[in-house]
Amino acid sequence: MLNFFAAAPKGFEYSLAQELTEFGATEVKESVAGVYFTASLALAYRITLWTRLASRIVLVIYKGSCESAEQLYNAAYCVDWPAHFSNKSTFSIDFHGTGGFLNNTQFGALKIKDAIVDRFRDDDIERPNVSRVDAEFKVDAHFRNGVITIAMNFSGPSLHQRGYRSTTGEAPLKENLAANMLVRSGWQASPSTLLDPFCGSGTVLIEAALMAADIAPGLQRSRFGFEHWRRHDKAVWQEIVEEAKARASLGVKRCEIKFYGSDIDSRLVALAKRNAENAGVLELIEFKVADALTIAPPAESGYLITNPPYGERLGNVSELLQLYYQLGDKFKKEFGGWKVAMLCSDIELVSSLKLKADKQMKMFNGALECAFNIYTLHANSTRRDTPVLPDGVDIADIAPAFANRIKKNAKLLEKWAKKEGIDSYRIYDADIPEYNVAVDKYLDYVIIQEYMAPATIPEAVTKRRLSDVLLALPSAIGINPNKMIMKTRERQKGTSQYQKLDERKLELITTEYGAKFKLNLTGYLDTGLFLDHRLTRRLVGQKSKGRRVLNLFSYTGSASVHAALGGAKSVTTVDMSNTYIAWAKDNFALNGLQGKQYEFVQSDCMQWIRDCNEQYDLIFIDPPTFSNSKRMEDSFDVQRDHVNLLASLVKLLSPTGELVFSNNKRKFKMDIETLTKMNINVTNIDDVTLPMDYKRNPHIHNTWLITHA
């Protein structure tokens, strides 16, 4: 009898142990990411050909304690390597594990390589060559807790590679993971009609058809690790292969199970058909292009086993939440008598099904931890009695307090926005503390920004509430889910407002009191326009006629545009970011503003103020709450530094000039006493700069008008 280890993804151990036991293996023992077992050579061949779950089978050649580099070398040297492989075969060592004397896997591999080469030489045999790529004989070594295990890769390339897959879709599912889904769902034990409405490249259905038709998953593999093993028995192996071929031919003819697969992507359906044809099971599976939400049950009962899209895989989160909710509704109403088994990594999406799982287990899709949930759907079951809205989501069922509040806000603010001449505004700002989000409308898009929840609230609770928000929004305000954009921000985190998110651009043009501005809804945490400063920008425009205007920390220059449109004699726009200076220039061009009177300066604003010798009639400054950019000489804290900042700016003001100063620090306290002693007048103008859509959050910013005394 020989000792083996069958490796598999984490979470497969129980299923794999059961499979090996059914094959007839003995001394079956589960371990981390695999199972140890004992088998004859013939049984090992059979397991390698027929296992649907293992990723790799290795033959254990040596196992013992190891406490030094010398002991590691000796352990490898004592193996009779010339009896295992020819010196004409190339070899490689795959070493895993560190600890104690061994802190480098390359060193471990090198010691074993030296021992193998020396063993050949000491037996008066020319040494074999090492090949880093595609070696013919592969040694697997594992070092853990002072024990070294040296093995031969018996199976060869990963066993999940059956040989039928031509190419993959965007989010391929490994074949042995699909097989484990079929095993753990209970389908393999009692096969019946099987449906996969998100079939992708067909992996779940093909693996199921291979099971039902008694086809060995390894039949189409062209290479096995034991082929260059000197103790390989070709006759025994060939007998096992021929038996499997005969069973496959008979199994396809006898198979009476019905398989149905569909996907909304016609390209993937075509790929699934090619893969099924390669696997020899195309005649058993009915594929079609269809939306999962329109699929009717193909039988009175059966299994629906699928790997639907989720966050790490495909799709937009708000669209996916809607999809899962509607799937749950469809399953309840139309699939009574069926079992549903779904693989998903996102707990929010799973909970959006609104179904109670019979079983919940963990599986790993590569490195991604997923939930595999199994549901039993009872006949004539409905989720609720209240009517479902056209988009499939009933407001009464999802976050009713939030849905009703934002619906009311949206209706009121839409009329107001039309009168104001704006098309971008806030419709919700954590009005209800449990739903701690801000929702901004930009033309026909909305951006949902989740505030950081207090540490006292469990993460599962905040995730549940957020998914409820995303589910309720489309019906509540009449928005298409694919025009919902989700962002996360923390309150008062310095320059986080300028953080770049990704390279994608979703650009729109918004209108504000006659001015036009370019928005980027996806590239950055903010969009290019701070909506809460809308009235402040208009105020700057109203005060600009015939005046020399300076805009510091200008961001995308929106206040500068209002100043120019307001008739400013000149406008100087200063920001440290080249990106935002370029954006400001785009905004000027968008409004037909050009000329030498409009100056754009990329500079550290604090240093620019110190170096400036010009006079201005109107200055607008909206500095960050805190900044320690590498491009600035010193850090800046608006509370700590505002007196010195304002004193420096007043020096740049003409005798009748005005300074509009604003910031977003929620607990900001203006040092009026010190500024008054410096002959500086300070007047709070929050009441005239807070827009209607921000009345629910009066501390969003504070604004001050400053002049010479």
Swiss-Prot record:
It comes from the Bacteria. Its main location: cytoplasm. It is an enzyme of class 2 (transferase). One of its GO terms (cellular component) is cytoplasm. One of its GO terms (molecular function) is 23S rRNA (guanine(2445)-N(2))-methyltransferase activity. Residues 43-154 form the THUMP domain. It is found in: Cytoplasm. The keyword Glycoprotein does not apply. Gene3D superfamilies: 3.30.2130.30, RNA methyltransferase domain (HRMD) like, Vaccinia Virus protein VP39. Its EC number is 2.1.1.173, 2.1.1.264. InterPro entries: 23SrRNA_methyltr_KL, DNA_methylase_N6_adenine_CS, RlmKL-like_Mtase, RlmKL-like_Mtase_CS, RlmL_1st, SAM-dep_methyl-trfase, SAM-dependent_MTases_sf, THUMP_dom. Keywords: Cytoplasm, Methyltransferase, RNA-binding, rRNA processing, S-adenosyl-L-methionine, Transferase. It catalyses: guanosine(2445) in 23S rRNA + S-adenosyl-L-methionine = N(2)-methylguanosine(2445) in 23S rRNA + S-adenosyl-L-homocysteine + H(+); guanosine(2069) in 23S rRNA + S-adenosyl-L-methionine = N(2)-methylguanosine(2069) in 23S rRNA + S-adenosyl-L-homocysteine + H(+). Belongs to the methyltransferase superfamily. RlmKL family. PANTHER family: RIBOSOMAL RNA LARGE SUBUNIT METHYLTRANSFERASE K/L, RIBOSOMAL RNA LARGE SUBUNIT METHYLTRANSFERASE K_L. Specifically methylates the guanine in position 2445 (m2G2445) and the guanine in position 2069 (m7G2069) of 23S rRNA. This is Ribosomal RNA large subunit methyltransferase K/L.
